[in-house]
From Swiss-Prot:
Compartment annotation: Cell membrane; Cell projection, Axon
Protein name in UniProt: Gliomedin
Natural source organism: Homo sapiens
GO biological process, one term: signal transduction
Membrane-spanning intervals of the chain: 18-39
Site residues (Cleavage), renumbered to this chain: 94-95, 280-281
Side Cytoplasmic, residues: 1-17
Record's keyword terms, sorted: Cell membrane, Cell projection, Collagen, Developmental protein, Differentiation, Disease variant, Extracellular matrix, Glycoprotein, Membrane, Neurogenesis, Repeat, Secreted, Signal-anchor, Transmembrane, Transmembrane helix
Length: 551
């Protein structure tokens, strides 16, 4: 235990000795730093005193020089020099050339004193020369020095007086549109405009429930149907001979005359009406034309029996429009296209390849067209002038036009002839001539047809079909017969003989598509129906009862 205590006291003593040694070392370093600082302070103090002494000497020299120069500047310019004794002048080496002028001598003494007794600082000399005049001699002006560096821009000066008004400048560009001003007084109400056109047909809705059974209709007129002449039946048995009559008295002999013309048979089987009456008189049976009874009537041969499968020619983006070919001249391959149901421009294509390639020229019409019922006949375009009851004939070659007003025709308030094609007037050309299909403004319900004279551009006759336009989707004319489709343009449900003025039984399919049928027209040059179906340009072959037209 005692040995452990002694070891602990030894360790504490060594620590105390280390601490005292560190304190002694720090004290020695502090004393050395203090001595070094005192030595530096003494050196700096002596250097400062030397600088102050030198500065004082320079100031005294500057003040002495300034006072001397001031004395020289105050001395009179014209004062004579002090007299000199002969010895002095003999000792003066500068007097060998004679006494100089007083002002030259004064200047020489000044220069001598300056060179002998003082070294003048340049700054002091410059200040002296600038403050006193006549002390410093100036030589000739030296060449101008180089231009100095550009100085800083000065402060903005005050605005000057406004100058005179200059000449008027050019018109500047249009500025921005200003704010809307105060609304003016209300003007007089304008005339009431026409109602806008219907929008495009929407999608077909869901099929509704069946309606109630309607009442039985009136019995139809059988005489309106075209009846085909039947085949000749077998000859009946001869009747019993009658009793012989009494002989008559002989007549006087007649004179011989020329043979008269042969009279045609009255009952030859080719009658102008809708039906042919076959007489029961046996005396006329043998004289009738047996071959004629085996043929159909000309009117029946002109009827359409069916429509063939369509061929698509082109697909365009416009829903409404027409594409037309010349009906009369088969050598003219041009095709004309009008886009939309209203416009003033017509596209003319050289032929069908140009139509497919999109190569065309524009033709500007004299009036806006309306509808999709235009035709081209003998190098002239016939169309409806928009917003009026007027037809226009525009000749392509001469670019001249004629107009024809159709009295009592419906052409406004969106009361279209055919709502599916936005059309008021539908023109048509067939083997019988030029026609126009329209609705009357008197009743506004029935479909009317007018035949036009191409030469005089006038109306020849009007035909009232009495068929309501509300049941019609579209229509066309072929070989003098009007054909009307249903409201969906899928079947032909009505036909009317325009030359005979009678209704004809007709009911056949037209197409299977339910797209918008904007145009439907018959062309007699190729016996096809031309249609515009929701942008599809289609051709339908037509099948007649007879392939040739009997006049």
């Amino acid at each position: 235990m005692a040995r452990g205590a002694e070891g602990g006291r030894g360790d504490a003593g060594w620590g105390l000795r280390g601490a005292l040694a560190a304190v002694a070392l720090l004290s020695a370093l502090n004393a050395a730093g203090t001595v070094f600082a005192l030595c530096q302070w003494r050196g700096l103090s002596s250097a400062l005193r030397a600088l102050e002494a030198q500065r004082g000497r320079e100031q005294r020299e500057d003040s002495a020089l300034r006072s001397f120069l001031a004395e020289l500047s105050r001395a009179p310019r014209g004062a004579s020099a002090p007299p000199q004794d002969p010895a002095s002048s003999a000792r003066n080496k500068r007097s060998h050339s004679g006494e100089p002028a007083p002002h030259i001598r004064a200047e020489s003494h000044d220069m001598l004193m300056m060179m002998t007794y003082s070294m003048v600082p340049i700054r002091v000399m410059v200040d002296l020369c600038n403050s006193t005049k006549g002390i410093c001699l100036t030589g000739p002006s030296g060449p101008p020095g180089p231009p100095g560096a550009g100085g800083l821009p000065g402060h903005n000066g005050l605005d000057g007086q406004p100058g005179p008004q200059g000449p008027k400048g050019e018109k500047g560009a249009n500025g921005k549109r200003g704010k809307m001003g105060i609304p003016g007084a209300a003007g007089n109400p304008g005339e009431r405009g026409e109602k806008g056109d219907h929008g495009e047909l929407g999608l077909q809705g869901n099929e509704g429930p069946p309606g109630q059974k309607g009442e039985k209709g009136d019995k139809g007129d059988v005489s309106n149907d075209v009846l085909l002449a039947g085949a000749k039946g077998d000859q009946g048995p001869p009747g019993p001979p009658g009793p012989p009559g009494p002989p008559g008295p002989p007549g006087p002999p007649g004179s011989r005359r020329a043979k008269g013309p042969r009279q045609p048979s009255m009952f030859n089987g080719q009658c102008p009406g809708e039906t042919c009456a076959i007489p029961n008189d046996d005396t006329l049976v043998g004289k009738a034309d047996e071959k004629a009874s085996e043929h159909h009537s000309p009117q029946a041969e002109s009827m359409i029996t069916s429509i063939g499968n369509p061929v698509q020619v082109l697909k365009v983006t416009e829903t409404f429009g027409t594409w037309i070919r010349e009906s009369a001249n088969k050598s003219d391959d041009r095709i004309w296209v009008t886009e939309h149901f209203s416009g003033i421009m017509v596209k003319e294509f050289k032929d069908q390849p140009s139509l497919l390639n999109g190569s065309y020229t524009f033709i500007h019409l004299p009036y806006y067209f309306h509808g999709c019922g235009h035709v081209v006949y003998n190098n002239s375009l016939y169309y409806h002038k928009g917003g009026s009851n007027t037809l226009v004939r525009f000749e392509f070659g001469q670019e001249t036009s004629q107009t024809l007003k159709l009295e009592n025709a419906l052409y406004f308030d969106r009361k279209y002839l055919f709502a599916n094609s936005k059309t008021y007037f539908n023109l048509a050309v067939d083997e019988k001539g030029l026609w126009i299909i329209y609705a009357s403004s008197v009743d506004g319900s029935s479909i009317l047809v007018a035949q036009l004279d191409e030469r005089t551009f006038s109306v020849v006759q009007h035909v009232n079909t009495t068929y309501p336009k509300s049941k019609a989707g579209n229509a066309f004319i072929a070989r003098g017969i009007l054909y009307v489709t249903d409201t969906k343009d899928m079947r032909v449900t009505f036909a009317f003989d325009l030359l005979g003025g009678k209704q004809i039984n007709a009911n056949f399919d037209l197409r299977t598509s339910q797209s918008v049928l904007a145009m439907l027209a018959y062309n007699m040059r190729d016996q096809h129906l031309y249609s515009w179906e929701d942008g599809h340009l289609m051709l339908y072959p037509v099948q007649f009862l007879s392939t040739t037209l009997n006049q």
